[in-house]
A protein has these predicted regions:
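Short glycine-/acidic-enriched loop or helix-start segments at secondary-structure transitions
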Residues: 18-19, 57-59, 103-105, 127-130
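Active-site acidic carboxylates
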Residues: 1-93
C-alpha cells in the first residue's frame, strides 16, 4: 500500500445499515465485513464520513426531506451514528449535509498528495459524488 494512500469510508451509518430504517441499503452487512477487513491495511490513514440532515433544508433538499421526514433529526441522533464496527475514535470523521463528502475538511485531513481509496455502501450516490468532486 502506498504511504500516501488513504481509505475514505463513506457513510457506514445506522440509518443505512439498520434493517428497520427506510434508508436501509441492501447488502450492508456484507459491505461492512469487507470494509472492516480492508481498513487495517491503511493503518492510521482511515477517515470516516457521515451524512447528516441540515437544520434547515434549502433548495432541492426541501422536497427530498418532505419525502423522508424521519431523517430530519439532529446530527447527534443515533440514526446518524457510524455502525458499531466503525466507531473508531482514533480516526477522523467528516460530517456533511450533502451526498458528496469532498470538502476542505476532508482535503485537509488527506493532504495535497494523497491517493484516495473510496468505499461505502451507496456507490451510486455518496461514493460517486465524493469521487467526482475530488476529481475536480
Amino acid at each position: 500500500m502506498s504511504d500516501n494512500a488513504w481509505l475514505v469510508v463513506i457513510d457506514m451509518q445506522v440509518i443505512f445499515g439498520e434493517p428497520g430504517s427506510a434508508w436501509c441499503t441492501p447488502g450492508y452487512p456484507e459491505v461492512e465485513k469487507q470494509i472492516a477487513r480492508l481498513a487495517p491495511e491503511f493503518g492510521d490513514r482511515v477517515v470516516f464520513t457521515r451524512f447528516i440532515a441540515p437544520e434547515h433544508p434549502q433548495g432541492a433538499w426541501v422536497p427530498y426531506y418532505e419525502l423522508w421526514p424521519f431523517a430530519l433529526v439532529p446530527p447527534t441522533d443515533r440514526l446518524y451514528d457510524l455502525t458499531p464496527t466503525f466507531r473508531q475514535p482514533q480516526h477522523p470523521v467528516v460530517s456533511r449535509t450533502t451526498f458528496g463528502k469532498w470538502d476542505d475538511e476532508l482535503a485537509g485531513i488527506l493532504g495535497p498528495d494523497a491517493t484516495m481509496v473510496l468505499t461505502g455502501v451507496s456507490t451510486d450516490c455518496c461514493v460517486i459524488s465524493t469521487a467526482l468532486a475530488a476529481a475536480d
